[in-house]
């Protein structure tokens, strides 16, 4: 298992902190006028999702987290678990709702996601950056109803709600950015 020194810390690096796999979100080297230099990092615990800030003296080390990001296909939801499959090996994994978090609102069957495995157990699901979903319900956009140029809420086929422009109607396909939860454009099949 690799060990990382404080001068090797960078955003996205996966390390073990307090026997839990964590991902470094932000890393800052601080050299005060008096005293020893240190590195301040903001980390997300991959098991719980909690974000904490930690400080390490220069030269401290952390072991790497033995996690693997695997592309998997979303199969179905049986009410309790979401089931994913590795397309190459047909190996299946069941993921609970607390691991899936808000990624559930962007998933439809056959979508390919990145599932993070630790000790062969799923601990995080990352949906594709952009998904194409159908609008199941939205208010009709009336002509002249554009004061402020705003939008209107639309419910998608997965149950997610996003703001869309007034010209978009029920039944249309739209492209959504899953990182921000925002409408990007209309989409073709």
Swiss-Prot record:
A Pfam short name: Elong-fact-P_C
Residues where N6-(3,6-diaminohexanoyl)-5-hydroxylysine is found: 34
This protein's GO CC annotations: cytoplasm
Single Gene Ontology MF annotation: translation elongation factor activity
InterPro entries per the UniProt record, alphabetical: Elong-fact-P_C (IPR015365), NA-bd_OB-fold (IPR012340), Rib_uL2_dom2 (IPR014722), Transl_elong_fac_P/YeiP (IPR020599), Transl_elong_KOW-like (IPR013185), Transl_elong_P/YeiP_cen (IPR001059), Transl_elong_P/YeiP_CS (IPR013852), Transl_elongation_fac_P (IPR011768)
Biological or metabolic pathway of the protein: Protein biosynthesis; polypeptide chain elongation
Superkingdom field: Bacteria
Chief site of localization: cytoplasm
GO biological process terms on file: peptide biosynthetic process
Record keywords, A-Z: Cytoplasm, Elongation factor, Hydroxylation, Protein biosynthesis
Cellular compartments annotated: Cytoplasm
HAMAP family in the record: EF_P
Family (UniProt): Belongs to the elongation factor P family.
Listed name of the protein: Elongation factor P
Lineage: Bacteria, Pseudomonadati, Pseudomonadota, Gammaproteobacteria, Legionellales
């Amino acid at each position: 298992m690799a060990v990382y020194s404080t001068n090797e810390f960078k955003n996205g690096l996966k390390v073990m902190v307090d026997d839990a796999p964590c991902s470094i979100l932000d890393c800052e080297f601080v050299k005060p006028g008096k005293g020893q230099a240190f590195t301040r990092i903001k980390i997300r615990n991959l098991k719980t999702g909690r974000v904490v800030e930690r400080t390490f003296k220069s030269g401290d080390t952390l072991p790497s987290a033995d996690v693997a990001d695997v592309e998997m296909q979303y199969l179905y939801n049986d009410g309790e678990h979401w089931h994913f499959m590795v397309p190459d090996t047909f190996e299946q994994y069941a993921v609970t709702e607390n691991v899936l978090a808000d990624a559930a609102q962007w998933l439809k069957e056959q979508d390919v996601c990145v599932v993070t495995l630790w000790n062969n157990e799923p601990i995080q699901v990352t949906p594709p950056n952009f998904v194409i979903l159908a609008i199941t319900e939205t208010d009709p956009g009336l002509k002249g109803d554009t004061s402020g140029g705003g939008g209107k809420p639309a419910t998608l086929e997965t149950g997610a709600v996003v703001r869309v422009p007034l010209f978009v109607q029920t039944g249309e396909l739209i492209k959504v950015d899953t990182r921000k939860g925002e409408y990007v454009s209309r989409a073709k099949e």
